[in-house]
């Protein structure tokens, strides 16, 4: 199935003034309601990474789990879950970050990675980059490296992809939106 960025964009619902006034939230749930669109998204990522040399997939809580788990299954890679604060039961590492809405913490089990591991980080969207930057810092604290940061959507005007690239982390997104695009 050939990737069609327009087809994907047409299924991402803009929700005006959510979660606060002035924000256009990019709702990806319609992608998951369409088997064709979900297959298109999953296959696009799988085809990009099928022959690449990394050891783990790291998925961001919560929407990153949806696509990250599919890709981990398709590529037969271990899946590392980067969770919101207070959700993991064992020893954790935590990292604070700023979002477009405020401040938050992301956590990962301290034994998730070993020195020398290489991780593909996956999320639904790159906005300010806060979540993925925090996850990258956690990966590095465990002695591993970030192979690439990937998402379905990029909001380049918020600078997250550029911040990741400035850290030496390549980025890949299936589509992008301007902040005012509906």
From Swiss-Prot:
Tell where it localizes.
Answer: Cytoplasm
EC numbers listed for it are 2.4.2.7
Q: What EC class is this?
A: transferase
Q: Name one Pfam family in it.
A: Pribosyltran
Reaction catalysed by this enzyme: AMP + diphosphate = 5-phospho-alpha-D-ribose 1-diphosphate + adenine
MF (Gene Ontology): adenine phosphoribosyltransferase activity
> For this UniProt entry, what is the primary localization, expressed as one broad class?
cytoplasm
Q: Name one GO cellular component term.
A: cytosol
InterPro entries given for it?
Ade_phspho_trans (IPR005764), Adenine_PRTase (IPR050120), PRibTrfase_dom (IPR000836), PRTase-like (IPR029057)
What pathway does the UniProt record associate with this protein? Purine metabolism; AMP biosynthesis via salvage pathway; AMP from adenine: step 1/1
Entry superkingdom: Bacteria
SUPFAM superfamilies (alphabetical): PRTase-like
GO biological process per UniProt: adenine salvage; AMP salvage; purine ribonucleoside salvage
| Alphabetical keyword list | Cytoplasm, Glycosyltransferase, Purine salvage, Transferase
Subunit record text = Homodimer.
Which family would the database say this protein is a member of?
Belongs to the purine/pyrimidine phosphoribosyltransferase family.
Checking HAMAP family in the record gives: Aden_phosphoribosyltr
**Record's NCBIfam families?**
apt (TIGR01090), PRK02304.1-3 (NF002634), PRK02304.1-5 (NF002636)
What this protein is reported to do is described as: Catalyzes a salvage reaction resulting in the formation of AMP, that is energically less costly than de novo synthesis.
* Name of this chain's protein: Adenine phosphoribosyltransferase
Q: Which organism is it from?
A: Pseudomonas fluorescens (strain ATCC BAA-477 / NRRL B-23932 / Pf-5)
Its encoding gene is what? Answer: apt
């Amino acid at each position: 199935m050939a990737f069609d960025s327009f087809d994907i964009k047409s299924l991402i619902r803009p929700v005006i003034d959510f979660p606060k006034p002035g924000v256009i939230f990019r709702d990806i749930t319609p992608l998951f309601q369409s088997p064709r669109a979900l297959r298109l998204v999953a296959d696009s990522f799988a085809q990009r990474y099928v022959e690449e040399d990394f050891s783990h997939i790291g998925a961001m809580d919560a929407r990153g789990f949806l696509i990250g788990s599919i890709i981990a299954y398709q590529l037969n890679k271990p899946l590392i879950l980067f969770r919101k604060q207070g959700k993991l039961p064992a020893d954790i590492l935590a990292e604070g970050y700023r979002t477009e809405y405020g401040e938050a913490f992301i956590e990962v089990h301290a034994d998730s990675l070993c020195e020398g591991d290489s991780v593909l980080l996956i999320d639904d969207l790159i906005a300010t980059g806060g979540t993925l930057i925090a996850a990258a810092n956690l990966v590095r604290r465990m002695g591993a490296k970030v192979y690439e940061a990937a998402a379905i959507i990029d909001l380049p005007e918020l600078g997250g992809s550029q911040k990741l690239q400035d850290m030496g982390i390549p980025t890949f997104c299936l589509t992008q939106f301007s902040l005012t695009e509906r």
